[in-house]
């Protein structure tokens, strides 16, 4: 047996410390907003029959043809690790009879798998938050879903991000637009990139999304969807934009924003950092942080009845890159000045935790100067030190001293001191605030014989 330690698989990651806290903060914020909007939580299998994805996503897409982790199980069935959530949720909707709950609002989060080149903020095992509304054909469903997405981003404290919005029209509009695009690009087919030449007959809308310079020179004059919108499709899009304005969600039109698969209808959208913003600087070329659209034709591809639906997904890793240390709540570290006070210090820690104050203590006694150094290296700047002082009458008192550095030190320490005092009184009802003329620290004492 080899003694060499196995390494992590390329494209995977071990998330730790501040990165893990930021990751958790994204999930916690999403869960909080999900509950505000009354989206039901669902948990989906990590793997499905391969046909769930090949039929839902499309055989010709890069995801299905190049990026899926598929394998044959012992029974001979072809299974695939999920590359996205929507197909599995659609399958569950059909096989579990969730039609009875329509319109159904569901949300989930978890790991997904795609075999692609790892890069900044993108991995082969990655994680997403996901929200879907199934069985609602009204444009107000799109507005609600987008308002939820906007509130999630704002709840994370991410600024400088704008909703980019387009319409793909209804089936009639889309087909007319598709035919016009094929005619337009056929005239310059020999000058297009190899990928776009391949897409010309199979998926011409994807050419509009090309970043290749050979294609981009022709995009400005390509036919636009607005010229082909039916009255119904135009009214739908106007209802969405009017609803967004009423909800206070800022948006801008993005006519080049498309979805290549035929089952997409009407609304397509992405939340993208503004040029020059802090978010754009952190993400680099991987600019989109949340995207989705209306997929009214998906259920039919899985053998179901026509069912309107709209959804979005966002990468947790990418969002975590933008929140920085927002998810990290620095603890109060409780230290004992002397070894015989160690148990008292542990009691102080428990009082803080029972009051929902993040607190930490050593597992064994350590001199306070060494403990200070250790915890400060981890970014901790707030301490409660338990000490003992002898009085002239032979009694002694236990001092509990709060000290630390906070962004707005004076005010924040005062507020924190009030919370700490209330929590300490759970176990120490005879706690007495101690006057400190020099204001070097906030402290309390307990009289003991």
Curated annotation (Swiss-Prot):
Protein's name according to its UniProt entry: Histidine--tRNA ligase
InterPro entries: aa-tRNA-synth_II, aa-tRNA-synth_II/BPL/LPL, His-tRNA-ligase, HisRS-like_core, HisRS/HisZ
UniProt EC number: 6.1.1.21
GO cellular component, one term: cytoplasm
Main location group: cytoplasm
PANTHER family according to UniProt: HISTIDINE--TRNA LIGASE, MITOCHONDRIAL-RELATED, HISTIDYL-TRNA SYNTHETASE
Family annotation (CDD domains): HisRS-like_core
Source species of the chain: Erythrobacter litoralis (strain HTCC2594)
Subunit structure, as described in the record: Homodimer.
PROSITE patterns in UniProt: AA_TRNA_LIGASE_II
Tagged with keyword Aminoacyl-tRNA synthetase: yes
């Amino acid at each position: 047996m080899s003694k060499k330690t196995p390494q992590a698989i390329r494209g995977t990651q071990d998330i730790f410390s501040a990165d893990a806290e930021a990751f958790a903060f994204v999930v916690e914020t999403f869960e909080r907003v999900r509950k505000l909007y009354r989206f039901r939580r669902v948990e989906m299998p990590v793997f499905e029959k391969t046909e769930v994805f090949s039929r839902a996503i499309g055989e010709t897409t890069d995801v299905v043809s190049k990026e899926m982790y598929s394998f044959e199980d012992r029974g001979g069935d072809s299974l695939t690790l999920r590359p996205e959530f929507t197909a599995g949720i659609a399958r569950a909707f059909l096989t579990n009879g969730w039609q009875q709950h329509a319109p159904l609002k569901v949300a989930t989060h978890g790991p997904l798998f795609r075999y692609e080149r790892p890069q900044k903020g993108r991995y082969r095992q990655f994680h997403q938050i996901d929200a879907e509304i199934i069985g609602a054909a009204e444009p107000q469903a799109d507005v609600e879903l987008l308002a939820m997405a906007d509130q999630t981003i704002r709840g994370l404290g991410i600024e400088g991000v704008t909703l980019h919005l387009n319409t793909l029209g209804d089936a009639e509009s889309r087909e007319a637009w598709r035919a016009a695009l094929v005619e337009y690009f056929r005239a310059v087919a020999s000058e297009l990139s190899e990928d776009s030449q391949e897409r010309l007959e199979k998926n011409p809308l994807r050419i509009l999304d090309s970043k290749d310079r050979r294609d981009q020179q022709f995009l400005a004059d390509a036919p636009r969807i607005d010229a082909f919108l039916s009255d119904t499709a135009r009214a739908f899009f106007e209802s969405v934009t009017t609803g967004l304005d009423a909800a206070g969600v800022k948006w801008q039109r993005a006519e080049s924003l498309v979805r290549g698969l035929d089952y997409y209808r009407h609304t397509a959208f992405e939340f993208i950092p503004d040029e020059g913003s802090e978010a754009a600087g952190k993400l680099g070329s991987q600019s989109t942080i949340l995207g989705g659209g209306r997929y009214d034709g998906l259920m039919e591809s899985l053998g179901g009845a026509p069912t309107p639906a709209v959804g979005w997904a966002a990468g947790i890793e990418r969002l975590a890159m933008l929140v920085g240390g927002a998810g990290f709540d620095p603890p109060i570290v409780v230290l004992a000045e002397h070894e015989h006070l160690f148990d008292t210090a542990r009691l102080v820690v428990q009082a803080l935790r029972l009051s929902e104050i993040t607190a930490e203590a050593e597992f064994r006694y350590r001199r306070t100067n060494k403990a200070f150094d250790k915890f400060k290296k981890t970014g901790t700047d707030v301490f409660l030190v338990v000490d003992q002082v002898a009085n002239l009458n032979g009694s002694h008192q236990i001092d509990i001293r709060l000290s630390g550095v906070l962004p707005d030190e004076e005010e924040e320490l005062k507020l924190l001191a009030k919370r700490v005092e209330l929590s300490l009184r759970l176990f120490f009802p005879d706690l007495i605030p101690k006057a400190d003329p020099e204001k070097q620290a906030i402290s309390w004492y307990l009289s003991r014989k």
